[in-house]
Structure formats: C-alpha cells, structure tokens
Amino acid sequence: MLKAFKAAILALLVGVAMLVTGVSAAQAEAPPSSDPDASLLQRQATSPEQLQEQVDLQLRLYPGGKQINDHEVAYDDGKFVITFAQPGRQLLASPDCPSGWFCFYDYANYGYPRGKLSDCGWQDLSAYGWHDRTSSVHNRTSTSVDYDNHTVGGHENDQYMFSNYSGGALNLSSTQTNKADHVYRYC
C-alpha cells in the first residue's frame, strides 16, 4: 500500500513538473530505440514506398508527430521537422537550412535526413528520435545555438560540445559526431 502511494505521489510530481516547465509527454526524454528496423530512418529510401515506410516507422517509434508531406514529419505543431531524403536525391555538399531555422544533418556534408528547429531555449532531441544523430549543422537564425551531449544520469552531467553561430555551417569533428542530445538557442 505504501509503495503504491509513493508511486502515485511521484507520478503526480512528475506531471506537475512537466506542466510548470512546459514539457509535454512527447518531449520527455525517450531512450534510443531498440527496434531492429530503426536503421531504416538513417538511410536514403530507394523508392516512394520505402520513403513512406521511413515516415511510418518514425511515427511508430516516436509518437506525437504528423506527416506533413511525402517526406516530412512535424512534431509539436511544426516546431520540430524531420525531412527524409527523397529517393534518388544526392548528397548535398552544401547546407540547405531554411531561413529562420537551425538544422542538423544525419551525415557529414549536410546529408539527409535533416532535423530542424526554430524555437528559443533548451530542446531535447531524443523526444523526436534525433539524439546521437548529428554529423553536420547549419544555423540560419539570428542567434547562436549550443549543442550538448547527455552522458549519464540527470541533466547536471550534460556536456557542452560546441556552438553554431548565426549563419554558420560546419561538419562536426570525429569527437563530436553523433553525440548531440540537446540544443539551446539563445534569443
């Protein structure tokens, strides 16, 4: 009885903390997927059918998003958007982040899939399945963006990795690649 009471109190406190901080259940930290098909999200589709499989898998593994066209999924009313490479699309070699957004790419040289955000403040990329998936970045906002690595335990152990300044585009070093878990945009 006491155990159940403690669990109920803890759940209530977590719910209140999420309401106070504005963090939705979809934004609560999600563990990396153990689904064997998850690698499909990180490679280029070879057909329109496989592209739809990627979109469907993204939505199954990381619920709360909405397909907005044949190759994009949006979360939190469009605050975070994942763009999958369309079949036949070549590696970019130059960044293509839209104005007003900051983007992070799964591959070096701005290779898709691409995630993009425009909100200010702290964002947890794991809520969208984008933790440990950044190899290049492009910032088209008017402010800088910090990237952090969540190592172990609570967020007090997060490690600052680098800043991406307004207008900046860069390929990450081998010590930074596929480690970003959180971003902070200064506004």
Model-flagged regions — what are they?
Residues E29-C187:
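Compact beta-sheet-dominated domain cores in extracellular/mature segments
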Residues M1-A30:
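Secretory targeting and sorting signals
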